[in-house]
Amino acid sequence: SGTVDARCFGVFGPDVPADDALDALMADGSVTRIVFGTDVNFTRRHTFTRGHVTLDFTGHTVTAQGVEHAKHNDPFGALFHFTGVPGDDVRTFPLAQPMRELYDVFEVPGAGGIPLYSWWQVSVNSLAGREEKEIDKLLCVTERIDESHVRVNYKMGWPLDAGRVMTWRRVEPIERVCVQDMEFRGNEGGEETGAQPLAFEYAVRCDVRDVRARHTYWPVLLRRHNTEYVTERCSLANPIEVVVGGTGYLTQQIHCLYGKVRDCTTSNARHL
């Protein structure tokens, strides 16, 4: 329990893939810090829904030699994809009243029964295109006002007219993950063999520090529906693709709130 070194599971270098050891440690909720004391290689793309854990690579190199092929056009097919779980409680409804800009009280049916501090993906119907929405964020309910209104941890950035269709979906986010101190080396080639270390979805307070990457395909760190996080002292040099849409980034942040990106650099890349 507590802190466990992956060498206890027979991982003494990149010759033996570290996938099974990582899966076993992540499956044990009593392990809160996983330490890698040697260079390591992974051959599978992992998805985790468990939080409250730190992955510390202690400055060693992470590779993905022989990794399983990625799905087409799937930037979330990282080596480590941490994700919360969307629930079955979905509420779709037209606004009965206009919503004011810079207002944190939101209309929602059955508000009196919504648990305090529960998390919801809150979005509005698009008026043009698919993603042109005034809101699509992961929000926390901080107060029940009455049977049809709650307060959330966000002040609305645009006014909405009555009749606009809102969708609230309950989410159990992944919380308090930290990945740190990694030298990542991706693969040459294209999308199938391309590799990148990290993706976070429906994530709260999930931080990344001191990840230095080269030769990635999709963003080194992809975030969607994240909030209250820090990305710091990370870098990317020489990604293998910068022309295809979405490639060649150090970090991409979609529908995110309250994040800090600081002391990060890129060289010969598409974007920070």
Locate the predicted segments by residue.
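Short glycine/acidic-rich loop motifs that flank beta-strands on beta-rich extracellular proteins
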Residues: R44-H46, A64-E68, E188-Q196, T216-L222, ...
